[in-house]
Amino acid sequence: SGNPVAMAAGITTIDLICKKNFHINLEKKTKKLMVGLKNAANKYNIDLQINYSGGMFGFFFTKNKKVKNFKDVSNCNQILFEKFFKLMLKKGIYFAPSSYEAGFLSIKHSDKDINYTINCAENVFKSLKEN
């Protein structure tokens, strides 16, 4: 609509994402989070598959090696996803509430944020395995 505040925000956003290595750094952060979640799940023998690109990601509780489409997601353990989601939420970590939805990481998520999330996930996986 040409609102000056919206235009200024848009220009600033474009300036930020045009900075050298912006997308490379964003993907590195996402990879760190996804690999951390995968390793934490593996530690407790929980089947977790991950998909990610740039700052967008998804993870799925399944033994299948690839999750590529709606049918694949439908065959995942939705009950385990819901339990994981709720336990992570209690720890202050908000993921997308369904494995049918994508999650997003931003360039502003710090290594401290990512490490905290991975540590919380490891505790949740341990709890899920014990129960």
Residue locations for each model-derived region?
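Conserved N-terminal phosphate-binding loop of PLP-dependent enzymes in the Aspartate aminotransferase
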Residues: 1-131
